[in-house]
UniProtKB/Swiss-Prot annotation:
Lineage summary: Eukaryota, Fungi, Dikarya, Basidiomycota, Agaricomycotina
Record-marked site positions (Not methylated): 13
Record membrane topology: Lipid-anchor
Domain of life: Eukaryota
UniProt name for this protein: Tremerogen A-13
Length: 13
């Protein structure tokens, strides 16, 4: 996980 993986998956690993 890197960014906003809750509402917006911007960087979900």
């Amino acid at each position: 996980e890197g960014g906003g993986n809750r509402g917006d998956p911007s960087g979900v690993c």
